[in-house]
Amino acid sequence: EKYNATDAERSYQEALDINSRYVPALVGIARVVGDERSLQRALAINPNSVLALETYGQLLLMNNRQEEADDYFERVLTLNPESLKTHSILAAQAALNQQDDEYAEHFARVNSFSPNNPKFLGDIADTLGNNYLFEEAVEFARAAIESDPNYWQGYTLLGNNLIRLGEEEEGKANLEIGFENDPFNVLTSNMLKVFDTLETYTTVESEHFKVNLSETDADILWPYLEPLLEEGYETLTSKYGFEPESPILIEVFENTEDFAVRSVGLPDIGPLVGICFGKVVTLISPDTLSANWQEIVWHEFMHV
C-alpha cells in the first residue's frame, strides 16, 4: 500500500518461512511480484478467501484477461457483497468504458454500506490515472479528499495526476501534504525528491515548448533540441490538422531513476526512455542513451 515492494516481499517471505500455508502472506507475495502460483496455492488452502479471489481478479485484469477476472470478482461479491475493493475495481472499469449505469450501480451499492467512502473514490482515481485519464483522475481524487480530508493517499493521487497535467505547483503542494501526514509512502517521497532535482535544473522556452533540463543539457543539448521541437511541431500539426495547447512541458532527466520516478512514481521503469502524458513529456538525456534521441523526441511528440 505504501509502494515499498522490497520490504513488503521480504516481510511476506518471512511470514511464509514460519507458516508456508499462511494465506494472507501468499496473497501478499502475489500482489508484489504478480505470481499466479501463489494465488493458486492460497485458493487451494482456502477456496473462499476473498482476499485471494480479489487479488487473482486484479492480476487477470492487469493481463487483459477481462472475462476470467469478472468470474473471480463475481465470486468475491457472492461471498462478500460489501467488498469495497471489488466494487471500486468494477466501478473504475465501468468509468473507463463509459458504462454510466454500471458505474452508478456500484457507487450506489457502496454508498448503501459505506457512504462517501474516500478509498472507493481514491481507487477509481488511481485506475483512471494509470489509464492516462488524468483530468478525470483529478476529479475523483478531489472528491475523495472532500469526503475525508484526512485521507492522505488522496493528496498523493491528486498531486501525482496534477503534475502529469503540467500543474506542478499545485501538484507538489498536495504531495507535500500527503508526505507530511504519511511519510512512509514511498511514491510520495520519491516524487518530492524529483522536485528537489528539478529545482537544480534550468527552464528554457521556445514558441510552443517549455523545457526543464540540467545546466549541462541547457548549454549543449538545447541549441539542437529547440529547432528539433519546433520543426516537429510545425510538421506534425500540419500533418494531423491539430494544434495542442501550448506551451507543452518537456522534462529531460540526466538520471534514469529520476526519469522513472517523475514518470510513474517508482525508480524502475524498464526499457522506456520517453513518456507522453498529453500536456507533459518526460525524457532521458541523450547522454545516457544509445538510441536515436531525435526519433524518440518526435515519437513522444506525436503522442501529444
Q: Where are each of the predicted segments found?
A:
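Structural signature of tandem alpha-helical TPR/SEL1-like repeats
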Residues: 2-14, 31-41, 63-75, 96-109, ...
